[in-house]
């Protein structure tokens, strides 16, 4: 061996290389500042409130009775629109007129039932809310048929053009 290896026998050879790498890694790790990890938290507050919405589409109905068969009451007439409904509760739809119909005239409304609900067919409208659809439960549907009917007795006589505001209400039950 040469004089260097004789004087410092521990710093030569493969085990020295391993120890040197380990010592270097250790000194870098211990000598380096620790990296701090920072976190933050928050609390998300959420809520879904009751949603009961109804809308109408299409032209407002115009109903004209202008024909009859001899010996029979005047021929009823119909008109239609569509409606859409969204609810996240169990609900029903009712309708009411803003004023009573003239004697001898009956205005009806029939709403197609959304999935799982029940339509009460053609219901005569009055100034008191009349149920048209019941059992509506947590859904949203559009393009549902809404059909109006106007029937008259001969005793109604001639009735000039008039109108009634129909208010549809969706109510949680």
Where are these regions (language model features)?
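General helical structural elements
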Residues: 22-23, 168
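Hydrophobic core
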Residues: 24-33
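Sec/Tat signal peptide C-region and signal peptidase I cleavage site
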Residues: 19, 32-36
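Helix-centric, low-specificity signal for extended rod-like, repetitive segments
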Residues: 11-12, 30, 74, 157
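Bacterial N-terminal signal peptides that target proteins for export
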Residues: 3-22
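General helical secondary-structure elements
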Residues: 14-15, 33, 160
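Serine/proline-rich low-complexity intrinsically disordered segments, especially terminal tails, linkers
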Residues: 5, 14, 29, 82, ...
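N-terminal small/polar-rich segments of proteins
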Residues: 37-120, 125-173
